[in-house]
């Protein structure tokens, strides 16, 4: 990986015609057991992602020296880059389990994107507007992947296909809702959720039963308090609902969650950036540690120029640097963010129903009024 990193940095734009030959092998190393290899692979992948928008038909003349086989391979693998850079190009994904819901077209696109991330062991942030079905889309890929993994293990007995449980972490007010939604949309034949809640003694009993369930739903505080238990398990999916909660990477909660081991990591949030650009770094540090560099490197490269450009007293040079930093950050994170707002999908949404309910004031309310 060190040699490849040197090649990428040394060739710079000269490596663009060969991007497709490097991206998938680098992806494979991003899940390496060696942490140093993982970090170096993530660093290389980040460098390649920044160059991906340049890989288009306009540079096909660079393919001249390549053999016919390599040109054919490059043409076929460009489809991967198209899917990575534009979620709408993701191949249509057929769910392997029945879902008790009719997916709207934008929800199917969301599932297609989640399946693409799954196929290449990538991780991402689904940040649709509230009410567009982030939970349903997540349940679809969760149930389908669990079923496929189970079937593959039955057929091959491969160690890397052995069924693993998944974990959903969400605010305490949503844990019951998640269990309800899973049971509503998916048969217990495919997902058996465990509502992991209660006082310490009750949770200790639930830990003994956890192996009988393939999905655990718990709140952020409980996962933080019981991290010694959760960190010992290898999860298939780890989904953070309202994941912007970990926007401050220095909190005990964020540090605890980053100890979790999972094949696939997904964040659900309607607001990936709440206060400052640095919020995004913490989210990606959970998804793909090293992808946006260290916190200090991120601040130096992105946060500081962007903040300085927004100052009313900033110079034209600082404003230009801020725009360039924003564009660079956008290119780097765009493949791993999917956001649709209600205005984008109005044609898919049912008509709004408005009902008025009249309530009698209580005696106390009457006096106050």
Residue positions per predicted region:
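Short inter-helical turns and helix N-cap capping residues of alpha-solenoid HEAT/ARM repeat scaffolds
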Residues: 33-34
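Alpha-solenoid ARM/HEAT helical repeat scaffolds used for protein-protein interactions
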Residues: 10-14, 253-256
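Alpha-solenoid HEAT/Armadillo-like helical repeat scaffolds in large eukaryotic proteins
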Residues: 25-29
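ASCE P-loop NTPase motor core, strongest for the SF2 helicase catalytic module
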Residues: 44-56, 70-310, 330-369
């Amino acid at each position: 990986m060190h040699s490849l990193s040197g090649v990428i940095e040394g060739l710079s734009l000269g490596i663009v015609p060969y991007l497709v030959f490097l991206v998938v092998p680098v992806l494979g190393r991003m899940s390496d057991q060696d942490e140093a290899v993982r970090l170096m692979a993530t660093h290389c992948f980040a460098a390649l992602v920044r160059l991906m928008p340049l890989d288009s038909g306009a540079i096909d003349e660079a393919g001249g020296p390549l053999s016919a086989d390599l040109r054919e391979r490059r043409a076929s693998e460009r489809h991967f880059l198209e899917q990575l850079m534009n979620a709408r190009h993701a191949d249509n994904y057929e769910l392997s389990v029945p879902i008790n819901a009719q997916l709207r077209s934008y929800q199917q696109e969301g599932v297609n994107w989640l399946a693409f991330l799954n196929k290449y062991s990538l991780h991402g942030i689904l940040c649709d507007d509230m009410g567009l079905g982030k939970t349903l889309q997540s349940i679809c890929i969760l149930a389908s992947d669990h079923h496929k993994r189970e079937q593959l293990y039955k057929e091959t007995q491969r160690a890397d296909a052995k069924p693993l449980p998944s974990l959903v972490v969400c605010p305490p007010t949503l844990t019951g809702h998640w269990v309800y939604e899973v049971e509503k949309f998916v048969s217990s034949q495919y997902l058996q959720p465990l509502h992991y809640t209660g006082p310490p003694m009750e949770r200790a009993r639930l830990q003994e039963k956890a192996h009988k369930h393939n999905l655990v739903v718990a709140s952020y505080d409980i996962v933080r308090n019981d991290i010694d238990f959760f960190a010992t398990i290898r999860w298939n999916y780890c989904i953070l609902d309202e994941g912007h909660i970990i926007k401050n990477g220095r909190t005990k909660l964020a540090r605890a969650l980053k100890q979790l081991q999972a094949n696939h990591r997904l964040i659900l949030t309607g607001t990936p950036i709440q206060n400052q650009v640095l919020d995004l770094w913490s989210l990606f540090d959970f998804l793909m540690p090293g992808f946006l560099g260290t916190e200090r490197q991120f601040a130096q490269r992105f946060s500081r120029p962007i903040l300085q450009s927004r100052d009313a007293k900033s110079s034209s040079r600082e404003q230009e640097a801020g725009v360039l930093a924003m564009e660079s950050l956008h290119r780097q994170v765009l493949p791993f963010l999917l956001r649709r707002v209600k205005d984008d999908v109005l044609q898919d949404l049912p008509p709004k129903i408005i009902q008025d309910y009249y309530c009698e004031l209580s005696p106390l309310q009457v006096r106050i009024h």
